[in-house]
């Protein structure tokens, strides 16, 4: 690979829960690399997503939403979020314009003040508020911290994304690319597969289930006809949650399986045979495999 004239930068995307971090990452990369659901705390581990623009490689770190942790799982999530701020060029502070008066956001700003990182303010969801509100939020955020640059976007509709990307490309330092031209993430394939199914679970059952469930891809096997056999286990903490996921006569888990299978086939471009199993494991949060979504 020719490194001459190439540029590369790494930016962590941080923010309060449900600010739209995973949606932004998917838009920046151009395809789905992170679960996007209406539930808070759907990002479990920090993940590198890669977007190449001519001679520039932009690496984005999708982090768990930063909040006040209580359980072991929550402490695991927040620890990984802060770890992502080490050895990077930029920290993108993503703010939901309708939820900017947020105590967790203030904690994020306080932490950044002591990091000496180039902090970029990005206001998301501008499509649902008046411009006067956007100006008010920018003024408030600059009263907390002097950001190097501010952008207004709608990650959902792709508004303002080009300006953000152009700025990141212009300010990226010269250096070798860290990932191959065709690589979009550093996450294992099994993790991607688990994320797809977990997303379907949260979208379908968001009013009935807590975020304390996990999907683990336990087996991926290629058949002679090049199709894939994928076996996944959905871990929940209560028997009642298992009943909800299974549904009457297994109809709910069948629906989720079909939706996940369809996405997997579109992404992988192969026929998929997906088998889902639901297990109750009261303290699954204490097991690494269940936290990260795949088993080796």
UniProtKB/Swiss-Prot annotation:
GO BP of this protein: ribosomal small subunit assembly
Residue ranges of coiled coil: none
SUPFAM superfamilies found in the cross-reference section: P-loop containing nucleoside triphosphate hydrolases
Compartment(s) of residence: Cytoplasm; Cell inner membrane
Ranges for domain KH type-2: 205-282
Keywords: Cell inner membrane, Cell membrane, Cytoplasm, GTP-binding, Membrane, Nucleotide-binding, Ribosome biogenesis, RNA-binding, rRNA-binding
Oligomeric and partner information: Monomer.
Protein name: GTPase Era
Organism in which the protein naturally occurs: Ehrlichia ruminantium (strain Welgevonden)
């Amino acid at each position: 690979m020719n490194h001459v004239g190439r540029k590369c930068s790494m930016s962590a995307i941080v923010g309060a829960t449900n600010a739209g971090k995973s949606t932004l990452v998917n838009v920046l990369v151009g395809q789905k690399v992170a679960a996007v659901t209406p539930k808070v705390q759907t990002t479990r581990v920090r993940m590198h997503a890669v977007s190449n623009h001519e001679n520039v490689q932009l690496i984005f770190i999708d982090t768990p939403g930063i909040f006040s942790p209580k359980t072991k799982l929550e402490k695991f999530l927040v620890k990984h979020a802060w770890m992502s701020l080490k050895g990077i060029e930029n920290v993108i502070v993503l703010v939901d314009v309708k939820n900017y008066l947020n105590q967790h956001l203030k904690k994020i700003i306080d932490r950044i003040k002591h990091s000496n990182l180039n902090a970029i303010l990005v206001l998301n969801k501008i499509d649902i508020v008046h411009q006067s509100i956007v100006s008010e939020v920018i003024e408030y955020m600059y009263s907390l911290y002097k950001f190097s640059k501010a952008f207004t976007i709608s990650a959902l509709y792709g508004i303002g994304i080009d300006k953000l990307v152009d700025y990141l490309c212009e300010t990226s330092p010269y250096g070798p690319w860290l990932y191959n031209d065709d690589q979009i993430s550093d996450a294992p394939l099994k993790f991607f597969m688990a994320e797809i199914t977990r997303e379907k679970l949260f979208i379908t059952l968001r009013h009935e289930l807590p975020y304390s469930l996990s999907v683990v891809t336990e087996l991926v096997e290629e058949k002679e006809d090049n199709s894939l056999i994928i076996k996944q286990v959905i871990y929940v903490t209560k028997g009642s949650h298992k009943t909800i996921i299974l549904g009457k006569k297994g109809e709910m888990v069948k629906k989720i399986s079909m939706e996940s299978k369809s996405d997997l086939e579109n992404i992988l471009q192969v026929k998929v045979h997906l088998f889902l199993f639901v297990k109750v494991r009261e303290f699954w949060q204490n097991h690494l495999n269940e936290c990260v979504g795949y088993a080796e």
